[in-house]
Amino acid sequence: MMIMTTRTFFSWFIVICAFWLTSFSSVPVHAQLKGTISTADFNPIPIAVTDFFSNDSIGLKIAAVVAADLERSGLFLPLDKASFLEKISNPNRQPHFPYWQEIKAQGLVIGQVIRENDGRLRVDFRLWDVFGQRQLKGRRFYTATERWRRVAHMIADEIYSEMTGESGYFDTRIVFIDETGPQNARIKRLAIMDQDGANLIYISDGSELVLTPRFSPKRQEITYMAYEHNQVPHVYLQQIEMGQRELIGTFNNMTIAPRFSSDGQKVIMSLLQNDGSANLYTMDLRTRMMTRLTTTSAIDTSASYSPDGTKIVFSSDRSGKPQIYTMNADGSNLQRISSNEGSYSTPIWSPRGDYIAFTKQLEGQFSIGVMHPDGQGERILTTGFHNEGPTWAPNGRVLMFFRKNPGMGPKIYTIDITGRNERQLPTPNDASDPAWSPLLNIQ
C-alpha cells in the first residue's frame, strides 16, 4: 500500500487548554478535544463523515468504517447523514461551512474513491475544521480493492491523530483464543481479526490446547503456548502474513505466559521448577540461549517489559499473595509497587510507559485497573464477576480485556484509561485472552 500527501493548508500547535466541547465557538476543533482527552467528563465531538464519492458502493463502505471507528473511540459523535444540508459531489471543492455549522458539526470528512487502470483503488480524503473554515488534513492512498477496510482504518487514524494529538489505533489487529463447545470439552483455537471484529481468520484448528497469544511490538508476529495432547508444552512463533510457524522451545515442565521483549529480540516466560516454584527466564530468539532472571521459591509470572526495555514488571506471590513487582531487565533492583488490598496479576506496561495495567481480585470481584510504574495513582477502571487479561492499544490510551459473567462464556471488551466508553467487541463465539497488535501501517 502506498500513501502520498496532497496538501495541508496549515499546521500549528496550541497550548493545551480545557474547553467545553458543547460550546460551538470558532476555536479550532482539534484544540478543543486535545484539552479534554484525559478526563472522564467530556462530551464526544460532533463530526460529519460524508459518503465518499465513487462510481460504486465502495465509497459508502469506506465512509461507514471511518465513522464506526471514530464513534467506537467514544471521543467522536458522527452525525446522522439525514441531517446534512449539503451534498458533496466534488470533494476537491471547499464545502459551504454555514451548512455544517448549522448542524453543529465541528469536523467534516469528505473523500472520493477512483479505480485506477491497474485495478488499484485511489482514495482521497480531506478533514475540515468547520468553525475555523480550514483544512486540517489531506491524504491520498493507493491500495488493492480487497484491502479497502485497511484504508478506512488508516483514514480514521489520521482523523483521530489530527483532532486529539494522540496516535490512532484503528489500523490494528487482535489475536485471541476462540472458545466453543461444552465447558468439560472446550475447543480453543487461535484467531486473529481487525480491531473492529472484521476479517476473522483462524490460525489453529483446535486439535491442541493453545494459550496466551502475544504480539511482537515490532512485527506482525505472535508467540503462544500449545500443548499437544494436553501434555507437552511448546512455545511457538508464528508469522501472521506468511503463516509460518516456528518452534522455539519444548519444556518438560509447564511454561507460563511467554511475551516478547520491547525490541522483539527476546521472549520472556515463566518456567515451573521441580519444587513447584516458577521463575522468570528470557530466550534470545537468535541464539536460543536461556537466561534466568529470578530465583525464588514462589511463583513469578506474567512478565512485561517497559517500552524502552530497561525494566520488567511481573506478578509474584513471594509476599504471600500475588502482587506486582518491577526490576531491571537483568533481574536487579527488585521492588514491589502494589500496596493496596487484594491480589494483583497480569501486569502489562503501557506502550507510552506512563501506566501499568493489571487485574485485581478483591472481595470476590475482579477488576481491571492502572497505576503508575512507581505504584502511585492506582485507579480501577471496571469491576465485575471475572475481568482479566488487559492488553494495550498501541497508543496507550485504550485497554482491552476479557470478561466472564455468571453462567456465560468469556467475551472481549474495551475501555479507555479514564474508565469510560466500555464496549463489547463482536466475536462469533466466546473469546478470551486478547492481545493487541502494533499499528499495521508502520510495518
Curated annotation (Swiss-Prot):
The record's InterPro entries line, in alphabetical order, gives: 6-blade_b-propeller_TolB-like (IPR011042), PD40 (IPR011659), Tol-Pal_TolB (IPR014167), TolB_N (IPR007195)
Keyword NAD part of the UniProt annotation: no
**Region described as Disordered:** 422-443
Q: Which domain of life is it from?
A: Bacteria
Its Gene Ontology cellular component terms are: periplasmic space
Q: To which protein family does this belong? A: Belongs to the TolB family.
UniProt-recorded name of the protein:
Tol-Pal system protein TolB
Q: Which organism is it from?
A: Bartonella henselae (strain ATCC 49882 / DSM 28221 / CCUG 30454 / Houston 1)
User: What gene name is listed for this protein?
Assistant: tolB
